[in-house]
Amino acid sequence: MPALPWTRPHPAPAHAPAFVMASRFEVHSLRDVPRFLLKSLAAWRQVTAAPGAYGASLDARPFKRTFYTLSAWRDRDALHAYARAEPHRGIMKDLRSTMRASTFVFWETTTDDLPLTWDEARRRLAEQAARDAAGGAAPGRG
């Protein structure tokens, strides 16, 4: 499945701050892929209506058992409200047992830099995965 292109649920004001999250999920087996994909599409639909969502993209690599998300938000609170709301909250709880690994990275930018690029997101995810493997967290994370 190709990446779902950057979607802009709500217009972002010019020159405004934006809070970014990128994630990488790897499921245990190929048997877990269809379920994860279906659930991730439900979460994707939720993003398109979430208050404060400036943009999002999903990149599914089913044969590698890996899924990437990239999103930009008005602020950290808007992202957290989305993550705590249904269906996202229930989906994450339901899929927890299928996860082999996950990586999350957060950073701030401006709306002038949207849409975000996958190259930048993957670079930051790789750096965070290396920190996680070494037992450290990103500066300012948490």
In which residue ranges do the predicted regions lie?
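Short S/T/G/P-rich N-terminal loop/turn motif that feeds into the first structured element of a domain
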Residues: 1-66, 80-81, 103-142
